[in-house]
C-alpha cells in the first residue's frame, strides 16, 4: 500500500515549489454559486448542472441549439466560493467547442440515438426509466448504466418531449424552438457541441443523425482556440455571482409513469 510509505524528504523538498504552484492554482477562487449543482438530476430531466453548460455554449457561439452531457457520473459542486478545482468537476475533459450545421431531421436523429442509449422503453409503470444493468450476485451494492453516461446528450434551444414508452426513432417530439418559433426538420440550424461529439464520439452524429464520418469536418463552422473549461472559468469570473437554474426545455413523458420511476431509479443508482 503506497499510502503507508514514508515520502522521500529530498523529493518533497525538490518539488515543493511546483507542488505549491499547482495547489495555489487549483485553489484560486473563480466566483460564487448561490445554489449547489449536481449531475444526478441530469439523468431524469433538465438540470442546473447541464443547463449551465448549455447556456454557456449558446452564449459563446450564438448557435440555435446546444448539445451537452454529464461528463462525470456523479459530480457535485456545493454552493459558495467556486475554485479552479471545482471547474474540473464541472467539465473534466479538454474539449474544444464546435459550432456545426445540422438539419432539423439530423437534430432529431441525434437525440433519438442519445435517449435510446439512456432511457429504457417502459412497458409498465413499474419498469426502470433508465437503461440500467441489473445487479449481479455478489455486487448488490453496485449499480450502473448499460452505456456510458458521458454520451447522454440533452439539448437546449428547443422544446421537446421524450416518450419513454416508445421505441427508438419515435421517442423524441420537438415541439418548437425555445424562442417560440416553429421547428423545421428541413431547415439547417447552427448547433453548439463539444469537439469529442463533433468528431463523431459516441456515434450520435454518425449512427444517430446519419452523417457519414468523413462528412463531419465539412459541417464544422467554427472551433474555439481554447478548451471549454477555459471559457467557463472566464465566464464565471466575469459574472462573479451566479445562480444556476434548470432551463426546463424538455421532459420525459408520460409523467405519471416517469415521476415515480425516476425516484426508484435514483435510489437504485445512488442508494439514496
Q: How should these model regions be labeled?
A:
Residues 1-272:
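Catalytic centers of hydrolytic enzymes
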